Each structure stands twice: as structure tokens, then as C-alpha cells.
Amino acid sequence: MASQGPLYIGFDLSTQQLKGLVVNSELKVVHISKFDFDADSRGFSIKKGVLTNEAEHEVFAPVALWLQALDGVLDGLRKQGLDFSRVRGISGAGQQHGSVYWGENAEKLLGGLDAGKTLEEQLSGAFSHPFSPNWQDASTQKECDEFDAVLGGPEQLAEATGSKAHHRFTGPQILRFQRKYPEVYKKTSRISLVSSFLASLLLGHIAPMDISDVCGMNLWNIRKGAYDEDLLKLCAGPFGMEDLKRKLGDVPEDGGLHLGKINKYYIDRYGFSSDCEILPSTGDNPATILALPLRPSDAMVSLGTSTTFLMSTPSYKPDPATHFFNHPTTPGLYMFMLCYKNGGLAREHVRDAINEKLGSPASQSWENFDRITLETPPLGQKSESDPMKLGLFFPRPEIVPNLRSGQWRFNYNPANETLTESNDGWNNPSDEARAIVESQMLSLRLRSRGLTQSPGAKIPPQPRRVYLVGGGSKNKAIAKVAGEILGGSDGVYKLDVGDNACALGAAYKAVWAMERTPGQTFEDLIGQRWREEEFIEKIADGYQKGVFEKYGNAVEGFEKMEHQVLEQEAARK
């Protein structure tokens, strides 16, 4: 009977909750259980899942909280009636960059769990350090400077590891940790990422790190497929490179590797089968691109408070402003990522200014913003001879490019490539509605243009499809402008998986790892089973001949504008 077929669990261990999502072989979701850290945990004085030490800009989570959460989610699935004996494979997604420090007795404690007690009761003593740094932590500026310098500069670090140094990345965090707590570091037997920590709990021994998530450390040389020894030496300091290598462990290349059977604790406590396999867990961003069969050169744009752009690509072209990771399942592909701080908040500022001008200051409706965006011609050009209106709108400091908060407006003439900072001809705030969406999308196109290929005869390089997720994906005007600028020969689609993308991606990864035929890629297996009509809706046209090319000219002006503003700001300091 189909109803007795195999099931697969995908976990998502994020900052504020642990989620367990169960799918069958046909990728249909049959159960979801959540454990909200603030609402459901006992004994932790956390806020939004974390603790803070503002004096040192530290943000971290108690690891014991996650132990409590895993039992909590599994209890929730049991109450929903999940038949654990049908679960054939488990994978997971973890908040990226966070590290867990295991003590000398970790393996013994993991291997000797008693099903009559909770994980928290038995494993709280398994860690040399009780906390895990969170991605919001900003305590490592000194260490980041050292990481950026050790290979010759941020460009060289990005070339080797896929990213320049970032506060949240695991390498700078480990360097600071071994300096701040040398005795604790010495007694640390192993270091896990949040993703491999989750897999370790399920396996009953320390799991290896995942081939994609390891790229979020500033330690893994992506080109060489090995840890970078110069970076390990810096990170390990007086304790030595070989000691750190042992702490980190080997990294298998196969994202679908069978790590081993589930630990006896879960068989006895919850009724899992002794044949249930544990698969590598990956990071939350890599898991997101597994929530659908994302083809090479397809793009995902997450339009939340911040903006995240994800693309699967065969090209490895790192830059200090971007991130590259190994693809979590498919050798020869990479995940390209852009992260912006100014996303939805910046658009809301313009929306509110427009509503106030039109006499409804308390309104949070997007109706006026959308209407004006669609009524305004591309780049504010009423005729071809008019200059293009370009701007940067940053209510909070930005990282791409690295600029203070502020607003800058320019007029650009593509015929003679002249760029003038000016409010002339700008009717604010109305002109800013389209200009802010264009500004955000032009930045994405500028930074991803070297990674796209032509999807067909006489069509310029661009994504095949653009998938929008997050709150902004509900906005038809944003979708239309996204298609005009980014292209998408097959159109612009809204991906509607709620906030389940990471857990779904992890569950799909488990299905693929357990049911693939030899050599079968994730994209092929999931592509055959994924019911497109249930998850996506075409919401805008993509490539439009003439309009796309016009925005290609605007990208040149946009790049000039960024350089000019950066130079002006450098001169001010």
C-alpha cells in the first residue's frame, strides 16, 4: 500500500526554532512539528533564540537549548501520529557559520544514551563550551582583518574560500575563541558546524561536515577541495594546524553519503527503524536551493527584510562582495549568494512617504506604491532623450556596496556615459517607487551577469527562470520590474513554500540520497517528482526584447554610480 511507503525527515535548526518536516517518496508533506525556542523552551533566558553580550558585540545560543528542542520536535511528531518505523532517511539544515565545541567525553556520551532520559539530561556535559556563536555576532573584526590579510587581501581570500572574511564566519570565530578561552580550546575534542552537530546527535557519534556548509568558514579552499593550510595555521595559533585539522575532521564530497544508521536512543524512545539512515545535513542557504529542482542559471530572490539572491551555477567567479559555496548535492555546480541589508525596509520607507503625500499616512497598503511603479516608465525616461534616473536608497548601512546609510540620486546619459548627482527632474517620492526596485534589481544583475548563459538562440545571457520568495514576492509590481531587469526567458515565478524552504530542501535531500540510481543528480530525481503547479505560480513575464537591453545600458551607469559614491565617501573620511 502506498500509505505504508517510506517517509523522510528534514530538520531546520534556525535561530528562533527547530522544525521537523516529514515527506513521502512523492515529496508530499505529511507532518510538520515546530519547537519555538522563546515560547517552548524551559530554563533559558533567551530572546529571539539567543543571548547577547553587547559590550563585546557577541551573540550566541546555549547548545543545550537545541537538545531540548530535538526531543520536543520528535515528541510533537509522535503526538501527530507519525509512524517512526516508516522513516527511512533523515537530513537537516542548520543556521550557517555557527560552531559547536565538543568536550573530550563527547563520543562516549553520544554513544551511550539512555532512552529513558532526555538528550538535555544526558548531553549537557558533552560540550567543552556551552554556547554556539550566532550569525548575528559581530565580535571578530580584528580576526577578520587577519584573515583578509593572510593570503594577500580580501580578493585572494575570496578566490580561495569563496568569500572574504566576515564576522559570522567560523574561521574568525574559532580564532577568537582559541585566544579568549585557550584552556577550553585545548580540551575541545571536535568542532562541529550547527548542521553537522544536528547529524551527530542523530548518529550517536561526531558526524563530518557537509561539503557545502564547510564553505561558510573562510577555511575551506574551494579550488583545491581541502582545508587551506595557511588559514588553518592562522586559526590554530599556538595549538598548531594538525590539532585543528583533527578537531574539524574530514569532509566527504558526496552530499548524499550514508553516514550511518540512527542511534539506538531514537529507536528505543520513538520507535524508529534500526535501518533508518542519517544523511549529511547542510546549511540553511544551501538547503533553500534544494527546495525546488533549481537548474543551473535559475535564480532565486528572497525579498524579506533583507534581500538574498541565490543561484546554482557551473561558474566559480568569486568576488569580495559575493559568496560562493560548493553545491550541496551536485559536484561541478556552485551556489552563488548575494546578501543585502537593505531590502523590504528600504521599499517600505518609500511606500510610507508616498502614502503620506497622498493623504493616508497611517496606511501600510502597497496599492499606491504599485500603481506608481507601474505607471512610471523604465528608469523614469518619458522619452529616449531623457536621462536615466538612478539611485541608492539605504536606510541602514549596506554591505554590498560597503556604504553608510543614506540616499543618492543621479541622472545618467548612456549616449555619452555622463553621470551627474542631481535631484533635477526627480519628482519625489513618486519617482522613487520604481527607482528603488530598479536599484535593488540592477545591483543583482550587475553582480550576477558573469554567471548567466544564453538560454536560447538570439537571447542574451540571463537566468532561465527567476523565482521570488518572501514577503515581497506577493507584490506584482516588484515581480514585473524584476523580470524586466533580470530577464528570465521562461518567466518570473512566485515560489510558495511559506517559511518551510530549508526544511523542505533537507527532506528532499534525504529522498534523493536514499532513492537515487547510480549517478542520478538531485535535480533529475526531484525534477521528475516535483509537482510544479502546487508550489509555483507564474506572476510576470521575464525577458522582454529592448527593455532588457535598455537595462543592460543602465547597469553600466549603475556601476559608475556606485564607484563615484564610494570615492566620495572615502574622501569624506
Curated annotation (Swiss-Prot):
Q: Where is substrate bound in this sequence?
A: 97, 168, 284-285
Tell me its EC number(s), please: 2.7.1.17
Question: What keywords appear on the UniProt entry?
Answer: ATP-binding, Carbohydrate metabolism, Cytoplasm, Kinase, Nucleotide-binding, Transferase, Xylose metabolism
Instruction: Explain the induction of this protein.
Output: By D-xylose, L-arabinose or L-arabitol.
Record keyword rRNA-binding present: no
Gene Ontology CC terms: cytosol
UniProt-listed GO biological process terms: D-xylose metabolic process; xylulose metabolic process
Under Pfam families, the record lists: FGGY_C (PF02782), FGGY_N (PF00370)
**Key word Amino-acid biosynthesis present:** no
Catalysed reaction per UniProt?
D-xylulose + ATP = D-xylulose 5-phosphate + ADP + H(+)
Compartment list: Cytoplasm
Paired cysteines (S-S)? none
List of residues binding ATP: 366, 471-472, 475
Q: Which CDD domains match?
A: ASKHA_NBD_FGGY_SpXK-like (cd07776)
A single Gene Ontology MF term assigned here is: ATP binding
Any idea what job this protein has?
Highly specific D-xylulose kinase which participates in the catabolism of xylose. Xylose is a major component of hemicelluloses such as xylan. Most fungi utilize D-xylose via three enzymatic reactions, xylose reductase (XR), xylitol dehydrogenase (XDH), and xylulokinase, to form xylulose 5-phosphate, which enters pentose phosphate pathway.
PANTHER family on file: SUGAR KINASE, XYLULOSE KINASE
Q: Which family does it belong to?
A: Belongs to the FGGY kinase family.
Name this polypeptide is given = Probable D-xylulose kinase A
